[in-house]
Amino acid sequence: MALLAPYLLADGRLPVGAHTYSAGLEPAVAAGLTRAQIPALLRARLHTTVVTEAAATALALRAALRAPVDFAPVQEALAARTPTAPLREASAALGRGVHRLARRLDPDHPAVTALARIRPRPLRPVTLGALGAVLGVGEEELVHGVVYDELQTIASAALKLLPGDPLDSVAWIVAAEADAARTVTEALAVRTPAELPARTPPLTEQWALEHDRRERRLFLA
Amino acid sequence: MPDNASAQQPGQPAQGPNEHYHQPLNQPRALRIGVAGPVGTGKSSILATLCRELAGELSMAVVTNDIYTDEDARFLRSAGVLPTERIRAVETGACPHTAIRDDVSANLDAVEDLEEAYGPLDLVLIESGGDNLTATFSPALADAQLFSIDVAGGGDVARKGGPGITGADLLVINKTDLAPHVEVDVTAMVADAERARDGLPVLALSKHDPESIARLADWVRAVLVRHRSGTHVPTDPGPMAPHSHSHDGS
Ligand SMILES: Nc1nc2c(ncn2[C@@H]2O[C@H](COP(=O)(O)OP(=O)(O)O)[C@@H](O)[C@H]2O)c(=O)[nH]1
Ligand SMILES: [Mg+2]
């Protein structure tokens, strides 16, 4: 089991472009979300989009460890459950950074070469599955990373969008522990791409569409 | 990608699930020049000037980084110096410094997309969205960079240094036409800058002075020649001023 890899994956400083992403916070703020509502947003996402993303990541890791590697079923299942084009595009843009890192670490790994065959570009959970295989991370650790990253992304973006005490951000994450644990359990229970839950809250979709048309934004999505 | 048909090997299908853009083997990828410097010192204007001067002879594209994503891109598109689709803005998550140094992913994506859509390109200009003297480009993104300061910032700026001023491939002292109005002696400012830069070039520029614009364009052409011949080595001015230059104080 890899010692450092899970920490690398969870580190916001990992240079894969994630600092350009607010995990839906900027679109939500534009629609009127207040600072006091951020903990509720974290919980809402943990029970919806994050279950889908984390489950897809675990499926992708399993696919990455099989021979031959075939990401198409999970990529297609996830794309079908991400109906809003700007969200698919954001996921693909973030996936591109992860793909670039995986290529740098192990260009000939079968999971990395399989990523290059996917068109349109692989979504982030698919690339994370490949990176997890490259780094030798287990599926539980990988899913922990996805869930934690979502919380940290929103909490960090809040410092730019709804500024306040940075220590609050930490407290929000700690308070989300129980919900995060449920998300992990649910995500790991998904065994096949066909079972991937479609958790697409209508407001998340609508806000993402509005954000895509907005000028002067700070974050990709 | 009809533009890239010439890059295909004979017999290889033009379309396919694994189609990637490949630069022709005999030609290096586009030269990427970063334009950094404090807000308002004329970076976007320099990009517009370079497009105006060079777009006739070179295939060019532009990437902007801004705190608010698309201000600079909109300015450049409205300047009409390049087809609008060749000007891309990247989101920086309110961290424009990170986007050109610690994590250049979004910028690399934009450059690669432009090469894929319009390649082969000769030159990609990348504008930084930084707001101070310390933001410089990582060599992972820019092959060469120019740093812009202006006379309106005061004659002392060049002497105070900072990584861009001391280490950028070219230092531009901009808006020299304003010097008489802000009581700055351009010659002295250039001399100060040259002392701070250990022989690296300094260019006094004004968008109203065609001769200075010609020198700027010539500098880009010269870097491009070196880039193509493989003799240009990207150097990193670093995120901090070298200690050996910090004795001036402030
Ligand atoms: N007088 C004068 N003004 C200039 C010159 N170059 C740029 N400016 C003006 O300086 C201001 C800021 O320029 P801009 O290119 O947007 O700077 P940026 O923030 O560094 O991109 C604008 O009002 C420009 O018109 C110059 O050579 N002379
Ligand atoms: Mg500008």
Swiss-Prot record, chain B:
KW Membrane (keyword) present: no
Plastid among keywords: no
Location of the protein in the cell: Cytoplasm
Oligomer and partners: Homodimer. UreD, UreF and UreG form a complex that acts as a GTP-hydrolysis-dependent molecular chaperone, activating the urease apoprotein by helping to assemble the nickel containing metallocenter of UreC. The UreE protein probably delivers the nickel.
Species annotation: Streptomyces griseus subsp. griseus (strain JCM 4626 / CBS 651.72 / NBRC 13350 / KCC S-0626 / ISP 5235)
Domain of life: Bacteria
Region Disordered: start-end pairs: 1-24, 230-250
Protein name (record): Urease accessory protein UreG 3
Keywords: Chaperone, Cytoplasm, GTP-binding, Nickel insertion, Nucleotide-binding
GO biological process: urea catabolic process
Bias-annotated ranges (Low complexity): 7-17
Record's GO cellular component terms: cytoplasm
InterPro entries with a match to the protein in the record: CobW/HypB/UreG_nucleotide-bd (IPR003495), P-loop_NTPase (IPR027417), UreG (IPR004400)
An example molecular function term from Gene Ontology annotations: GTPase activity
Similarity section: Belongs to the SIMIBI class G3E GTPase family. UreG subfamily.
Role played: Facilitates the functional incorporation of the urease nickel metallocenter. This process requires GTP hydrolysis, probably effectuated by UreG.
Pfam families: cobW
Cited SUPFAM superfamilies: P-loop containing nucleoside triphosphate hydrolases (SSF52540)
HAMAP family (UniProt xref): UreG (MF_01389)
Residues annotated to bind GTP: G37, P38, V39, G40, T41, G42, K43, S44
